Amino acid sequence: MEKMSQVILLFFIYSFIGWLWETVYCSLKAKKFVYRGFLVGPYCPIYGFGVLSVLYFVEPFENNLLVLYVGSAVLVTILEYVTSYGLEKLFHASWWDYHDVPFNLNGRVALPVSLFWGLGCVLIVKVIQPEIAKVVSFLQATFGNYLALCIVIVMGLDLIYTLLNMQGFKKLITEMGQTLETNQQEFKQRLNTKMEIATADWQKLKERTKKEHFQNRLNFQQRRFINNYPKLTLKNIKNSKEVRHLLEDLKNKGQ
């Protein structure tokens, strides 16, 4: 049980550090506060899983810097690709996109990013982990296994809430796509008129769709996803670009 408690504490600490890194980096880049993370709480589990994978599979080779670097980069890249693929299949959405980064693979991973992760993992193993290990030992000595148990409960409830919330989001964007598809049929019947009139009619149809079907449908967590993930791409959704624009409009107007 003590070993499991150690793993849970390490997972939480590195998940928090990952969330802190992403939040600070993205906030500076966007010049505004950006609350990152798939879950509600201040942690990004992908970082926890990534660092734990490195610590338990690659750290034994820490004296061989090349193996440590390459092994870390490969492990984290595989995890990033699998996570991206899984989220897309589950929720019909892509949370990050590396298509504009050189040497990318399906926009899910990219060589420059992987090389950066490799450097980060070397820094963690050589410099950060020895200090984190001291913190974990202190926490275990102070709180026993209770802190780890609380972390599991809180993150578990957070995960359940987020999954339910994302299922609602998936249902909403699917409904949006289908509704816009229906409205397009009405729009096509007007193409024999002047283009500017048809365009104006299409804008009215979209506005009517927004007001009649989708106002007040986005909750706080869903607005956060749209606001803090500008590269969020909808997959396998009818009229995905129009749905994305509609989501932005609803979010900006607080509806």
What is each residue range found by the language model?
Residues M1-Q255:
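Aromatic-rich, lipid-facing transmembrane alpha helices and their immediate juxtamembrane interface loops
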